[in-house]
């Protein structure tokens, strides 16, 4: 193997090592999906009727408050 070929191979090797090191910190898609599913199932949504009792957004207004349509 010539000197120039060796330099190219070593440079490519360093580039691949850097990419591998960088990819270890990236979150996998499956882990991100699982985290999103957990959040959605454990966090109540006030816009979904019946999720946790009466929907706060559909309750009649109390008192002399101002309502904007």
From Swiss-Prot:
Q: Which InterPro entries match?
A: G-protein_gamma-like_dom, GGL_sf
The organism named in the record is Dictyostelium discoideum (Social amoeba)
Lipid bilayer topology:
Lipid-anchor
Where is lipid attached as S-geranylgeranyl cysteine?
66
PTM annotation, UniProt:
This protein is thought to be subject to lipidation, and this requires phlp1.
Gene Ontology terms describing biological process: aggregation involved in sorocarp development; chemotaxis to cAMP; G protein-coupled receptor signaling pathway
Record protein name field: Guanine nucleotide-binding protein subunit gamma
Cellular component GO terms held in the UniProt record: cytosol; heterotrimeric G-protein complex; plasma membrane
Which SMART domains does this UniProt record tie to the protein? G_gamma, GGL
């Amino acid at each position: 193997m010539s000197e120039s070929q060796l330099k190219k191979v070593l440079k490519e090797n360093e580039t691949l090592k850097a990419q591998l090191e960088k990819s270890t910190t990236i979150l996998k898609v499956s882990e991100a999906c699982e985290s999103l599913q957990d959040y959605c199932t454990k966090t109540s949504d006030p816009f979904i009727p019946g999720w946790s009792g009466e929907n706060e957004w559909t309750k009649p207004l109390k008192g002399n408050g101002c309502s904007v349509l």
